[in-house]
Amino acid sequence: MTEKRVEQLESRVNDLECQLAFQEQTIEELNEALSQQQMLITRMQDQMKFVVGKVKNMDGSNLADASEETPPPHY
């Protein structure tokens, strides 16, 4: 191989190594973001289950019967 060809190959290898390093960093950052989002989704699902449970356990005794309601002022 000629000296020029060896330099070209070394340059290409260096470029590929740089690209690989950046890709590895990007993958790590994406993995961290995904992990945080999954934790947030899990927390939100737990909160939603809690709220749904509260709503299901509410009784209608706080609501007045329609016949007991006073008519609105424009009546």
Curated annotation (Swiss-Prot):
Name of the protein described by the UniProt record: Protein SlyX homolog
Pfam families per UniProt: SlyX (PF04102)
Tree of life domain: Bacteria
Matching InterPro entries: SlyX
UniProt gene name: slyX
Entry similarity comment: Belongs to the SlyX family.
Organism: Vibrio atlanticus (strain LGP32) (Vibrio splendidus (strain Mel32))
